[in-house]
Amino acid sequence: MNKSKIEWCDHTWNPITGCNHGCHYCYARTMTARFSGDVRLNKMCKADYSTQTGPDESTLYILDKPMLSETGHPLVYPFGFEPTFHRYRMDTIGKLKMGNNIFVGAMADVFGEWVPDQWIEEIFTVCLEHDEHNYLFLTKNPERYMKLANAGKLPQQNNFWYGTTVTRPDQEYAWFESGTYNWFLSIEPILEDFGKFGATVKTAPPWIIVGAQTGRSKNKVIPEFEWIKNLVLTADTFGKPIFMKDSLIPIVGEKNMRRDFPKQLLEKTISEKMQNKLYEACSECGKVLRKNQMVALMARSKRGTPAKQYPS
């Protein structure tokens, strides 16, 4: 569990890493190469992991505990960018006491065709157990959402957000009817103008995220100001929030940046354990207040009785 540098979430959680999409602009593939060690040697340590065949017949790796390097340090991506289920990471969610917006699978496509339903269901189970957080999922395979929904396996909780990543206006994305599932659209990197987008939909997505391609690729696409303006107009026409990533500052300027969130993602909740630690019922009025907003008055009816808590 890591604090995130991704502007639209608080933390990233990566119980699954690796992806088979093969996108040429993928930042995650480049990053894993720096923290994988010698993948060939890692695969020789067969006692440290297990494998299974994925739904698409690809080889998948499973780690029930971290694999260590020769120096005793955990290898974050011991199999490079090959799909890996880090089952030992499933309990890290419980270490967060305050409610957070958590991006699940920043270094993978959790809903790729190669990912077994069992892996996804295990992740959902953990998320459901810790409902003080908002969980944001992203995929380039939105059809998997539909398959899971039709099978009754896609949680409909209000704190689950299902996003689709697209880069061009002709790509498919998951569209859920209002009142069913929370969903959003991530247009990153934006590679073409979405200018006609607003004229072809009956309403905008509940949330739009947009960002430019980063890195030093000689073929990097630099979006035009009008491309971003058109998306903002679409969002504003339908009264929907839009979030611009910092990669757009050179394109639109800081004063034109929009960093809107859906209302729910701005609300923070806390775990039951932290609730009991920080809050207490006033002994006089019965209201539940933060302890640091209350004062203990030495008002005792007789010697030996505890002081009562009153609002400050």
Task: Label every PLM stretch briefly.
Residues 1-11, 35-38, 56, 61, ...:
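Auxiliary Fe-S-binding modules of radical SAM enzymes
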Residues 20, 24, 283-286, 311-312:
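Cys/His/Pro-rich metal-binding microdomains
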Residues 29-37, 128, 137, 154, ...:
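N-terminal, helix-rich and Lys/Arg-enriched segments in bacterial and organellar proteins
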Residues 82-245, 250-253:
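Conserved AdoMet/S-adenosylmethionine-binding subsite of the radical SAM
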Residues 1-101, 278:
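N-terminal [4Fe-4S]-dependent radical SAM core
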